[in-house]
């Protein structure tokens, strides 16, 4: 609630008419807004299908219904844990391990690859947005510089993550270095042999799974297709919200604002980004692109009802269901991931 209070303080400091916000919200077309809500649900569904395409290839046993619940559970944790950028993935990892769906290394590989695909699409969306703005004559120097910084940051992270995923020796050296440090800190009292062996086994599963993706682009392409559909639904939500307020906006503005917000959330640095800060960022970006202040704040609130509060409550229901009814699915196929010969 502190985040929401901060958002309303932000509105007050920038002299946004709160009564105007309420009056504008009351004019929203309920039918169009209902479609926006439906698109918000479809966004999560296709995100789930995209991720499950990767888990299926790695023989991680999980039905589409179960995967959908896992994603909703992760979204719920995203809103309450101040490490939003990775908390949902950690939650899904925990659930898959708890329900014995597959080896830890393979599970992490599926989430790692899925995050890489999402970040790549984000970069494409940012570039497309700035091109549309440029040719539309709406380019703001501040927004342009922000997009450049975000795009470079995400691209650099993608590059580093790809290198890490294929350099098994680096990971093994990191494990060895970490265990030596731990032994020095504990003066040799901590016996790290068993834990080190487990870490090496997990690392092998992870890197073998990433090699499998490398030699089978079909699963990556299919996942990328569904993730693209996810993005279309995601971008349609704010567009429909503005449409419901009888204020159509350009797709370039939607691309830019959505990409910047999602880009910051995608950077794994543990920023508590779910309540307060995104509202301020969205309102500022809308205003900087010519949307009246009261309308910008109203649209932000209506969008966040769908992308935050609806997810919070549905995620809470999913969390309760999964905790009360753990999976009874059989243990995943113990066969290790095959390693293709190096070309």
Language-model segments: which ranges?
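Mid-bilayer segments of alpha-helical transmembrane spans in multi-pass integral membrane proteins
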Residues: 75-86, 103, 115-127, 131
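Helix-loop junctions and terminal segments of transmembrane helices
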Residues: 52, 90-94
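Predominantly cytoplasmic-facing regulatory/coupling regions of multi-pass membrane proteins
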Residues: 1-72, 132, 141-262, 266, ...
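Interfacial segments of multi-pass membrane proteins
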Residues: 95-103, 279-295
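Alpha-helical transmembrane segments of multi-pass membrane proteins
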Residues: 73-78, 109-121, 226, 298-307
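Membrane-interface alpha-helices at helix entry/exit sites of multi-pass transporters
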Residues: 65-69, 84, 88, 100-116, ...
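Transmembrane alpha-helix interface/packing and boundary motifs in multi-pass membrane proteins
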Residues: 76-83, 259-279
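Short intracellular "coupling" helices and adjacent cytoplasmic loop segments at the cytosolic face
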Residues: 72-90, 98, 186-195
